[in-house]
């Protein structure tokens, strides 16, 4: 549960930052794009709780792992420049099924079989390790995102040189739109940064899957 929470919380932190830095979302719109993940758990959690004694928790957790992998792969191969709001919101909505079928069933499995006098201590330890894993996941995700962006930025920048006809053609097009050479260089640098952020985020999503 701690490892899964590490991946889940890292993605929660990464997605709004990506939407704001690359796609120009405000904090409100980034929150709205992330919010659909909470819709399904609101509906399913009471149902799962009511029929928990009739359900095999292991199957629910396995289903949630599969859904997590599907959503992370979905993001890894669909996040690209110019994507619309739905491209970020739909994976969040589907991930709600994974959230609903993960936390409560896995907590039930973790605490099942313990004597009543040890239940409080086990629950506290489980909550502590889950919170700690979330903090570690956030640190790892943000650090990896920054470092990978720097690497991809350097690799992409190498292609922008006087010997690359595509780069020279782009400069000519930008200057034809009224930009000076300095403005064109600044615009290209921003596009390279955005590409680096998207590629590094997609790599993190792929690893998480």
Regions found by a protein language model. Name each.
Residues 1-121:
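Transmembrane core module of solute transporters
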């Amino acid at each position: 549960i701690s490892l899964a929470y590490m991946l889940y919380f890292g993605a929660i932190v990464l997605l709004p930052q990506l939407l704001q830095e690359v796609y120009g979302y405000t904090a409100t719109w980034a929150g709205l794009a992330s919010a659909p993940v909470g819709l399904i758990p609101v509906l399913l959690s009471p149902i799962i709780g009511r029929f928990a004694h009739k359900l095999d928790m292991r199957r629910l957790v396995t289903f949630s792992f599969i859904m997590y992998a599907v959503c992370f792969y979905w993001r890894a191969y669909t996040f690209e420049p110019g994507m619309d709001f739905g491209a970020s919101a739909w994976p969040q909505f589907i991930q709600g099924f994974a959230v609903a079928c993960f936390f409560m069933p896995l907590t039930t499995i973790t605490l099942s079989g313990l004597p009543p006098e040890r239940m409080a201590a086990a629950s506290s330890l489980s909550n502590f390790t889950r919170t700690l894993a979330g903090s570690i996941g956030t640190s790892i995700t943000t650090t990896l995102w920054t470092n990978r962006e720097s690497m991809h930025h350097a690799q992409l920048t190498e292609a922008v040189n006087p010997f690359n006809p595509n780069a020279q053609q782009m400069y000519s097009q930008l200057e034809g739109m009224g930009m000076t050479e300095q403005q064109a260089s600044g615009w290209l640098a921003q596009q390279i940064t955005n590409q680096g952020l998207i590629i590094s985020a997609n790599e993190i999503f792929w690893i998480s899957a």
